[in-house]
Amino acid sequence: MVRFILSRLLMALPTIAFVSITVFALIRFIPGDPAALMLGDMAQPEQIEAMRTELGLDKSMPQQFLIWAGNVVQGDFGRSIVNDEAVLPLVVSRFLVSAEIVVVAVLLASLIAVPAGVIAAWKQNSLTDLALVGTATLLLSIPTFWLGLLLLLFFGLKLGWLPVLGYVSIGDNLVGGMLYLVLPVMTLVIHEMGVLIRMARASTLEVLRLDYITHARAKGLSESAVLWRHAFKNAFGPTWTMIGLILGNLLGGIAVIETVFTIPGLGRLMVDSIFARDYPVIQGCLLFVSLSYVLVNLFVDLLYPLFDPRVVAE
């Protein structure tokens, strides 16, 4: 087990290095001069050149990368060009907002969709199976931004049951924070349920065809015992991987939901920074999203042996 964990950690290091180089390179190739942007339109060429020297932009790309990577390791992501705010605290505060929404949404979607997918597999080709698969297909076909607007108009504006726009932290106000979370979380849950129902159904069907399931049935075990005690654990492995992928994808792609509901999360910060050409903040957001995706998948890999111990042996 220790060897398995070490191998996964070592495999993550090249990925993190590649992500860092890619983020650094992407920002450097964006049109525009950060020094000129910081000084404004009235700046003289001499002032711009002095600012480029101060920012280290006059150095070669490899030198710039080493300086930037060294600063990042020390927790220095630079300062925002727009408001001169330190990038790391800004990105972390916005990331926590996004993470709160995404984690709650993925947890709820998993609790509903995984049992539904297992039941659909158990009742294969029945009316229940057809209804669940049809529902999953329908949920997958709905664009998230359209669904978010629909829920906002119906529950927020027409019925007036829930706050329409904005965000309140659960830590500051438990009840108010939960009310503000309902609509964005519901939007994500409805969409991701479609993916998880289909994945749980497919993996469960595959396991139910294995010999040890036939043996368990031959021993006289009830169908519910065969399903939940013997089939579910092995069937959950691929679904667990999909949950990790969904979690990572949502952390990087929640900008649409945050824009619809005006939530001050990481996705909206990235969009605003792109329009403002705030390069240090864009770079910090991209790096944070990329690293969170890598770490989420590393976490998924490390827990996978709980569902399939054969992974460690292999």
Question: What do these predicted regions represent?
Answer:
Residues 15-66, 159-180:
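Hydrophobic alpha-helical transmembrane segments of membrane transport/permease proteins
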Residues 26, 30, 38, 42-43, ...:
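Hydrophobic aliphatic residues
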Residues 22-29, 59, 70, 134-165, ...:
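Membrane-water interface segments at the C-terminal ends of transmembrane alpha-helices
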Residues 2-3, 13, 89, 95-129, ...:
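Alpha-helical transmembrane segments of integral membrane proteins
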Residues 58-114:
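An internal, D/E-rich "acidic patch" concept
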